[in-house]
């Protein structure tokens, strides 16, 4: 992995086709929320299958916490669709059969010349694609548990949401004064001018 892809760095804003064939950027998919990004070997790998099954089971909690999930795989379009369906994922999968991400990040898994995959990584990104945490998943035990992801996402969310602690000084006064700009969701309502 490139040395700049570390906590505090910015992850590249790749533009790749999703499982429907639509080209999407990571920043578009992330919006202003935290994001879990998996860089996957592909559908053929049982370790990927297991990790993504666990993420799919965790996904309802991820969704209610205003967090995004994206998987980038070297699979072609059809195989990518099968991968996504086989694990019951309802988040965006991006296809990179040209291995743009693999080459740019320097994560070719050279021990598998048959498939030429990426070394698997899971990243937790703060808004703006800012790297909070990087997990190297070449070995399965290097991949994060849902408990570790929960802790990482708690850290990121507490840093980016001014209304994380409603008892914080000034929040109640701002709310009572009609200033909802510090309150997630309320800050985007049309009546918050």
Residue ranges and their predicted role:
Residues 1-193:
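Chalcogenol-based redox active-site neighborhoods
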């Amino acid at each position: 992995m490139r040395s700049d892809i570390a906590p505090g760095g910015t992850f590249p804003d790749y533009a790749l086709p999703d499982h429907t064939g639509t080209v999407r950027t990571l920043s578009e998919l992330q919006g202003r929320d935290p994001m879990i990004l998996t860089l996957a070997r592909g559908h053929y790998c049982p370790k990927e299958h297991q990790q993504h099954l666990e993420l799919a089971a965790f996904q309802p909690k991820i969704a209610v916490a205003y967090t995004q999930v994206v998987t980038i795989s070297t699979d072609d379009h059809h195989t990518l669709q099968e991968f996504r369906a086989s694990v019951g994922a309802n988040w965006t999968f991006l296809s990179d059969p040209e291995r743009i991400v693999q080459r740019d990040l320097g994560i070719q898994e050279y021990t598998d010349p048959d498939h030429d995959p990426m070394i698997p990584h899971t990243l937790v990104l703060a808004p703006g694609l800012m790297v909070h945490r990087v997990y190297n998943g070449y070995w399965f035990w290097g991949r994060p548990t849902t408990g570790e992801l929960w802790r990482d996402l708690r850290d990121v969310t507490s840093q980016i949401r001014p209304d994380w602690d409603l008892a914080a000084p000034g929040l109640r006064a701002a709310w009572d004064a009609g200033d909802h700009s510090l309150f997630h969701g309320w800050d985007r309502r049309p009546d918050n001018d």
